[in-house]
């Protein structure tokens, strides 16, 4: 007899992509309508800008389906506007919004997207846009491909995170790509992430590139801390990815709970001191794939910064977000788009 998913925490978050994908191409600024095809290999030149020079951007979205009602797609308009920012930063043609939403909806409508390689009520959606031109030199691509992949997601309570404070490498510098969701933002992470895992940590804590003192992000998650009576999160700048989960948490905290949310720089020194004097009571991360997760510890060279284990604010915010996504609470801010599953 198989255990319910919640009791199998050793299973990975994802296994593989759903069997079908959506695809559209852009020639000279004209996009084809989205087509459906078997998820798999595409004919692509190895010199394509997307492969050779990292001209590639993506999104990560989420949808819920209870198996009966229409599927609930979360904040797709926000994902589209971030995709526009990312494409523009890399000088790429942007898929029109209608095409983008249609391709995502097609994926959700297909019941097999939710059932293979394993059945799930939550679908992770990965739109990708990449340059197809195969120039010898790094020139922005005129021919561009847009694909929408999906993958069923496993949800169950996960262990609090242990973060490795990265004092040598940096994620993003001022004027760089940190605020755009580009593949290039991930290329530099493999080595630091591997080192963090070697040190027994789950993820990298990224600090600012200039001083390595200010907290920016945790791997691919935004960061929140409860300090005194305030929910504090690093202020957005071009070195920080503007997470949609981050934004949703801020809205929930402010508008539903009247909690004061402050966006400002947070240093590691302040965090260590605020834990010491008892004013820092909670720390957690926010992202689409991992949703909201607590931080247990930051390993910073020889010292360990340990966080309190009780997380009442985090628990409340996570429940609120989950209830909206699942249709168990009012969609007060119009975050949900319903898509019938055929
Ligand atoms: C995608 C991403 C996030 C989280 O953003 P969400 O919109 O909440 O999923 C945070 N940091 C980085 C670097 C990311 O790529």
Q: How does the language model describe each region?
A:
Residues 5, 116-130:
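Extended, Lys/Arg-enriched charged tracts that mediate electrostatic binding to polyanionic substrates
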Residues 1-107, 134-342:
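Helix-start/capping segments and mature chain N-termini
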Residues 19, 111-112, 127-132:
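Active-site loop/lid in soluble adenylation, ligation, and acyl-transfer enzymes
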Residues 99-122:
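Non-catalytic accessory segments adjacent to catalytic cores
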């Amino acid at each position: 007899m198989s255990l319910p998913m919640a009791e199998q925490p050793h299973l990975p978050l994802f296994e593989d992509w759903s069997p079908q994908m959506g695809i559209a191409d852009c020639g000279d600024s004209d996009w084809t309508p989205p087509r459906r095809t078997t998820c798999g290999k595409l004919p692509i030149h190895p010199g394509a800008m997307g492969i050779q020079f990292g001209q590639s951007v993506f999104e990560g979205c989420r949808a819920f389906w209870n198996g009966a009602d229409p599927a609930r797609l979360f904040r797709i308009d926000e994902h589209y506007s971030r995709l526009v920012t990312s494409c523009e930063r890399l000088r790429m043609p942007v898929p029109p919004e209608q095409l983008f939403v249609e391709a995502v909806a097609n994926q959700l409508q297909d019941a097999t997207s939710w059932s293979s390689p394993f059945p799930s009520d939550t679908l992770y959606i990965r739109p990708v846009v990449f340059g197809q031109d195969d120039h010898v030199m790094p020139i922005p691509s005129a021919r561009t491909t847009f694909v929408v992949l999906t993958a069923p997601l496993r949800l169950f309570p996960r262990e609090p995170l242990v973060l490795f404070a990265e004092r040598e490498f940096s994620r993003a510098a001022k004027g760089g790509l940190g605020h755009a969701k580009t593949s290039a933002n991930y290329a530099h992470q493999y080595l630091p992430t591997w080192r963090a895992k070697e040190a027994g940590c789950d993820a990298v804590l990224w600090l600012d590139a200039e001083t390595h003192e200010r907290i920016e992000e945790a791997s691919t998650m935004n960061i929140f801390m409860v300090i005194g009576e305030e929910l504090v999160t690093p202020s957005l700048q071009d070195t920080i990815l503007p997470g949609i989960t981050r934004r949703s948490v801020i809205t929930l905290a402010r508008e539903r709970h009247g909690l004061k949310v402050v966006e400002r720089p947070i240093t590691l020194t302040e965090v260590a001191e605020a834990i010491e004097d008892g004013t820092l009571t909670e720390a957690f991360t926010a992202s689409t794939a991992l949703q909201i997760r607590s931080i247990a510890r930051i390993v910073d060279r020889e010292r360990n910064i340990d966080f309190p284990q009780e997380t009442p604010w985090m628990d409340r915010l996570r429940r609120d977000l989950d209830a909206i996504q699942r249709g168990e609470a009012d969609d007060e801010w119009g975050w949900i788009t319903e898509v019938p599953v055929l």
